[in-house]
Amino acid sequence: MELYTVGKIVNTHGIRGEVKVVATTDFVDQRFADGATLYLVKKDQAPVELTVEHARMHKGLVLVKFKQFNNINEVQHFRDAELKVADQDQAELEEGQYYYHQIIGLTAETVDGRVLGKIKEILAPGANDVWVVDRKQKTDLLLPVIDDVVKEVDLAGGKVIVELLEGLE
């Protein structure tokens, strides 16, 4: 079973077993819905299946309470663990939309065929995502994900075609 990250636990909240989660999904309401199944993944440990009892937004974070845990002592060791969802639980996306894991690792090329590097990370600072391209012997290139820049995404070919606007490089 393939698992995909939807959030990271950064701390506990209160004494009743809630955790603070930085969400890395555009589907917060769906991923953290009451009764949703998530997998807790800590480094070098097998995933643990958890069921969301309830979740709510609080100061830009998602506060999540799992059915399996009822006090702070049971969830303290979850700090820095990732919350993941199974591949079969992923929502269908509209045409032209992609999951982060589909984009990370693709090669970025210009419209004239010049290889820029590999996409290593996706930032979500505001209105649109920003792809971080790892370039050899250069600083990372930040590409805004807008129609003027991203011309084509070729998942089968493992690349994205971009047009570098003035000031991007």
Swiss-Prot record:
Protein name: Ribosome maturation factor RimM
BP terms from Gene Ontology: ribosomal small subunit biogenesis; rRNA processing
Domain PRC barrel: 94-168
Organism the protein comes from: Limosilactobacillus fermentum (strain NBRC 3956 / LMG 18251)
GO molecular function terms noted in the UniProt entry: ribosome binding
Keywords: Chaperone, Cytoplasm, Ribosome biogenesis, rRNA processing
Annotated domain remarks: The PRC barrel domain binds ribosomal protein uS19.
Described function: An accessory protein needed during the final step in the assembly of 30S ribosomal subunit, possibly for assembly of the head region. Essential for efficient processing of 16S rRNA. May be needed both before and after RbfA during the maturation of 16S rRNA. It has affinity for free ribosomal 30S subunits but not for 70S ribosomes.
Protein family: Belongs to the RimM family.
Domain of life, source organism: Bacteria
Gene Ontology cellular component list: cytoplasm; ribosome
Location relative to the cell: Cytoplasm
NCBIfam families assigned to the protein according to its UniProt record, in alphabetical order: 16S_RimM (TIGR02273)
InterPro entries per record: PRC_barrel-like_sf (IPR011033), PRC_RimM (IPR056792), RimM (IPR011961), RimM_N (IPR002676), RimM_N_sf (IPR036976), Transl_B-barrel_sf (IPR009000)
Subunit-structure text: Binds ribosomal protein uS19.
